[in-house]
Swiss-Prot record:
This is DNA mismatch repair protein MutS. Transmembrane segments: none annotated. NCBIfam families: mutS1 (TIGR01070), PRK05399.1 (NF003810). It comes from the Bacteria. InterPro entries: DNA_mismatch_repair_MutS (IPR005748), DNA_mismatch_repair_MutS-lik_N (IPR007695), DNA_mismatch_repair_MutS/MSH (IPR017261), DNA_mismatch_repair_MutS_C (IPR000432), DNA_mismatch_repair_MutS_clamp (IPR007861), DNA_mismatch_repair_MutS_core (IPR007696), DNA_mismatch_repair_MutS_N (IPR016151), DNA_mismatch_repair_MutS_sf (IPR036187). SUPFAM superfamilies: DNA repair protein MutS, domain I (SSF55271), DNA repair protein MutS, domain II (SSF53150), DNA repair protein MutS, domain III (SSF48334), P-loop containing nucleoside triphosphate hydrolases (SSF52540). PANTHER family: DNA MISMATCH REPAIR PROTEIN MSH1, MITOCHONDRIAL, DNA MISMATCH REPAIR PROTEIN MUTS FAMILY MEMBER. The keyword Transport does not apply. It comes from Streptococcus pyogenes serotype M4 (strain MGAS10750). Keywords: ATP-binding, DNA damage, DNA repair, DNA-binding, Nucleotide-binding. GO terms for cellular component: cytosol. ATP binds at residues 602-609.
Length: 851
């Protein structure tokens, strides 16, 4: 930036900008926020606004761009959404009264993790995450500045940190230490996060008291310091710091949650088609956020789960009362975010009216809850604080038709303040007084067309035409002379005018002061409001789960301590909702104490993945306290779910399907316990056939012998079904098919035993591949099945680590050993599971040329 001949105003800009080099500086100048230099050039491009210059005729004009102050929020939202920070510098004094340059200061730094106001408000949480490291463990704290939620935990490794950040869907991460290059690449390049830095711990320990580890304290303290530094105000709405342990909830990685479509559909990235979409019959924004949290973090405490179940059952048994409850909750606004707006000094009259309307609903909600006559519901009722004094204050103070801004007046109700009522009376009756004076002077003077007018320069005046100047009374004094008339005033008129102007000015100022006082009073209730918000959110989620259970005919699951899984006629809740009850085919799932692994075989499109996801969703719904989609369910309590369902490359990090498979398998076998659930779908398909088969077998044996977790392993390797003769806790199941007159029908029903065929060519037929290609594939299949012998893969002793023995078991399919070797290499290189129909056809053509 060239600083030659810089004006005082621009010098002020540069002085402020140097303190915020990583943020766009919005510099208030009159009715606009201006940006200069590089900020202006970049903002003009990002916001699609005009780029001009200051001092256009100068040798080096300063680039400039601006946005109107009244619509600035929508432009700020765009910059924040793109991952930038915005510093807002306001005028701190009236420009008309300023001596020299108007005083300006940054009043707030808005970052992706600290958004409070938005032109497009979202009911979802917006978490800012802070992480610290003590050389052994990681401290992770997170906060939603818009709701005041504040939590902290400690984690063993960076993989856990990454997963927790992903689960929180954070956009900004605050660091208190130096990351390794690999870790920084993961957060910035792969996860697209904004990294910020803070080395100072917030001094006020009262906000982070409790039994915390040192690394938890530093993470929480640095997070608080950063938030106070960027928001530049006291944050009275911050809730008490909550310490949590990952082990207190059903553990699932972000990849697991994505593959199960828990909070959004993995294919569309939309809520529709997810478990969250299915279960959401909430009526409040607070309830929506809490429901998502329950889905993200199912419980592992049987007592807590049963308590939720009891309340849902009570709600189910009382349709009329539950309907009344749902209708009453519709009148509840977002108390958490309204409280934060009060704390930030941004609450307007409409916000207070929404708060008052909500509080007016609370007694009705409380009465409905009491009518259920349930000890479990009463525990919620007893904690409900209706805040009647606050509701009364808002109801009697704020005009129900008050505008959204505090500068337009008409905010305070008549009768709330005597002085304000007096000023309003003066303004209201002043017009009548003016009319009375006009009539009196017209009659006394004999000037028939005498009238009183008003303008800003002369105020109120008598308008007298030149033809009537001789009739002007002596007590009139001249205020202005025009070509064809004169303007006069009187002492009486001046007195009335003074009273009216004083009333207008005093009324506006007094009304503003009264509103500020009321808002300050509301702020003293924030802690009580937040407690009320939590209870109402809990009630909302529980009634939502009751509505969903009744609508979809869900049942109450049971839990056992025997490691037994019994699901009778279970359904994939989301698929059933999308397809319709009549079309969905239910499946029972059974694991006795002896069984730890189900090996499931069957063709693609037959329902293996749905069967696996059905079990996972049933477990998640059950452990979050929900009723489930089945005729009967009895489950053990799981501590974690690990999945590998669906093939996908991680293109951003450059990892292949097979690498992703192996990494997820590694996480499962390292972290799973005998209380975990593992779901592996076609593990090993990302590499050559025998490599994949060998790894699949080794993983199954490892889980069987060392982990003991309940596992469903879906595979196309039919040779693996022989493992049931060796592994006592493994059973075979398959997807049943009906074969008639050459046509195959997938029944989508799970049956005992292994599948006898793969029906891969039939699936290719359904996909519409050319008949000639299908015919050739059938010929090749027949030849392979005729000429090949058993691979003997199951006979490999467990101690053999190399796959060479497997390869040595392969026979030549052709007499010419050299050609056979060439063809064998070509076959091993084929990644069947990830080929498109066109690639399959091309590959078959190339293989044919080798014969």
């Amino acid at each position: 930036m060239a600083k030659t001949n810089i004006s005082p105003g621009m010098q002020q800009y540069l002085d402020i900008k140097k303190d915020y080099p990583d943020a766009f500086l919005l510099f208030r100048m009159g009715d606009f926020y201006e940006l200069f230099y590089e900020d202006a050039v970049k903002a003009a491009q990002l916001l699609e606004i005009g780029l001009t210059s200051r001092n256009k005729n100068a040798e080096n004009p300063i680039p400039m761009a601006g946005v109107p102050h009244h619509s600035a929020q929508q432009y700020i939202d765009v910059l924040i959404e793109l991952g930038y920070k915005v510093a807002v510098a306001e005028q701190m004094e009236d420009p008309k009264q300023a001596v020299g340059v108007v005083k300006r200061e940054v009043v707030q730094v808005i970052t992706p993790g600290t958004v409070v106001d938005s032109a497009k408000p979202d009911s979802a949480n917006n978490f800012l995450v802070a992480i610290d490291f003590d050389g052994c463990r990681y401290g992770l704290a997170y906060m939603d500045v818009s709701t005041g939620e504040f939590c902290v935990t400690d984690l063993a490794d960076f993989t856990s940190v990454r997963s927790e950040i992903q689960n929180l869907k954070a956009k900004e991460v605050l660091l208190g230490f130096d990351l390794s290059e690999e870790e920084q690449t993961i957060l910035v390049k792969q996860m697209n996060l904004l990294l910020s830095y803070e080395e100072t711990v917030y001094e006020d320990k009262s906000l982070i008291d409790g039994q915390l580890t040192t690394v938890e304290l530093t993470a929480a303290g640095k997070l608080l310091q950063y938030v106070h530094k960027t928001q530049m105000r006291e944050l009275s709405h911050l809730q008490a710091l909550v310490h949590y342990e990952i082990k207190d909830y059903l553990q699932m990685s972000y990849a697991t949650k994505s593959s199960l479509d828990l909070v959004e559909n993995a294919r569309t990235n939309k809520k529709h088609g997810s478990l969250y979409w299915l279960l959401d019959e909430t009526k409040t924004a607070m309830g929506m956020r809490l429901l998502r949290s329950w889905i993200d973090r199912p419980l592992v405490s049987k007592e807590a789960i049963l308590e939720r179940q009891e309340i849902i059952q009570v709600f189910l048994n009382a349709f009329i009362e539950r309907t009344d409850l749902s209708n009453s909750l519709k009148g509840v606004y977002d108390i958490e975010r309204l409280s934060s707006r009060v704390s930030f000094g941004k609450a307007n009259p409409k916000d207070l009216l929404q708060l008052g309307h909500t509080l007016a609903q609370v007694p009705y909600i409380k009465a409905i809850l009491e009518s259920f006559n349930s000890a479990y519901v009463d525990k919620l009722v007893n904690d409900i604080d209706s805040l009647p004094e606050l509701e009364y204050l808002i109801r009697t103070a704020i005009d129900p038709d008050a505008p959204a801004t505090i500068s337009e007046g008409s905010i305070i109700r008549n009768g709330f303040d005597e002085r304000l009522d007096h000023y309003r009376k003066v303004m209201r009756e002043g017009t009548g007084w003016i009319a009375d004076i006009e009539a009196k002077e017209r009659q006394a003077s004999g000037i028939n067309n005498l009238k009183i007018d008003y303008n800003k320069k002369d105020g109120y005046y008598f308008h007298v035409t030149n033809s009537n100047l001789s009739l002007v009374p002596d007590h009139f004094f001249r205020k202005a002379t025009l070509k064809n008339s004169e303007r006069y005033g009187t002492a009486e008129l001046a007195k009335i005018e003074g009273q009216m102007l004083e009333a207008r000015e005093e009324s506006s100022s007094l009304e503003y002061d009264i509103f500020m006082c009321i808002r300050a009073q509301v702020e003293t209730y924030i802690n009580r409001l937040q407690k009320l918000a939590k209870i109402l959110a809990t009630v909302d989620v529980l009634q939502s789960l009751a509505v969903v259970a009744e609508t979809n005919h869900y049942i109450r699951p049971q839990f056992n301590d025997n490691h037994v899984i019994t699901i009778q006629e279970g359904r994939h809740a989301v698929v059933e909702k999308v397809m319709g009850v009549q079309e969905y085919i239910p499946n029972s799932i059974s694991f006795d104490q002896q069984t730890s692994i189900q090996l499931i075989t069957g063709p693609n499109m037959s329902g293996k993945s749905t069967y696996m996801r059905q079990l996972a969703l049933t477990v998640i719904m059950a452990q979050m306290g929900s009723f489930v989609a089945a005729d009967h369910v009895d489950l053990p309590l799981f501590d974690a779910i690990f999945t590998r369902i669906g093939a996908a490359d991680d293109l951003i990090s450059g990892q292949s399907t097979f690498m992703v498979e192996m990494m997820e398998a590694n996480q499962a076998i390292k972290r799973a316990s005998d209380n975990s659930l593992i779901l592996f779908d076609e593990l090993g398909r990302g590499t050559a056939t025998y490599d994949g088969m060998a790894l699949a077998q080794a993983i199954i044996e490892y889980i069987h012998d060392r982990v003991g977790a309940k596992t469903i392993f879906a595979t196309h390797y039919h040779e693996l079904t022989d493992l049931s003769t060796k592994l006592t806790s493994l059973v075979n199941v398959h997807v049943a098919t009906l074969e008639k007159d050459g046509d195959v029908t997938f029944l989508h029903k799970i049956a005992e035993g292994p599948a006898d065929k793969s029906y891969g060519i039939h699936v290719a037929k359904i996909a519409g591949l050319p008949k000639s290609l299908l015919k050739r594939a059938d010929e090749v299949l027949t030849r392979l099945e005729t000429q090949s012998r058993s691979t003997e893969i199951m006979s490999v002793p467990p101690q053999v680590e190399s796959s060479s023995a497997v390869r040595q078991g392969q026979l030549s399919l052709f007499g010419d050993e050299e050609k056979a070797h060439e063809i064998r290499q070509a076959l091993e290189a084929i990644d069947v599971m990830n080929m498109t129909p066109l690639q399959a056809m091309t590959t078959l053509y190339e293989l044919k040329k080798l014969l």
